[in-house]
């Protein structure tokens, strides 16, 4: 009888869904960057690929066809990340479920055409590596020549794992 119970318990445990905590986030060798060096997703997990998010208009008094309407890199990144957060929430996910992020930054005219990595990082740190949401995704950040609108400085894609 005991043997049957143990066998049943083992089979039940083996068929139980994998918990979100089963995702392994490997620390980056350089602890100065708030990202994971790598993220392992166990077999059987559902990956959710979220299309690129661009910023909403943040300054309604600026001309709609201007960079000023969308703000600087930090403002644009914050808006895009809020959009991603809302989209994930609609799917029953959170920013803590994000395992991979790709960030496309256009050179900021106010910064001599160079990407504002520091401004992006300030926005990013509001959503990742906080006391409330400590999970860090693996991330790639790159400067690109342009995005779909000449007024966008930021576009962000994420991949999340369904817990």
Task: State what each model feature region is.
Residues 2-82, 86-102, 108-163:
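N-terminal presequence-like segments and the immediate start of the first folded domain
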């Amino acid at each position: 009888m005991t043997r049957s119970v143990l066998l049943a318990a083992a089979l039940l445990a083996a068929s139980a869904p994998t918990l979100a905590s089963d995702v392994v986030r490997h620390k980056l060798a350089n602890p100065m960057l708030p990202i994971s060096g790598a993220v392992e997703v166990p077999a059987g997990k559902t990956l959710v690929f979220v299309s690129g998010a661009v910023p909403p208009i943040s300054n309604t008094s600026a001309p709609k066809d201007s960079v000023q309407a969308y703000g600087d890199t930090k403002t644009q990144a914050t808006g895009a990340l809020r959009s991603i957060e809302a989209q994930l929430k609609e799917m029953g996910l959170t920013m803590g479920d994000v395992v991979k992020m790709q960030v496309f930054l256009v050179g900021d005219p106010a910064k001599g055409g160079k990407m504002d990595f520091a401004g992006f990082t300030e926005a990013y740190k509001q959503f990742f590596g906080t006391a409330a949401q400590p999970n860090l995704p693996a991330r790639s950040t790159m400067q690109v020549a342009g995005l779909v609108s000449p007024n966008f400085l930021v576009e962000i894609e994420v991949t999340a794992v369904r817990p």
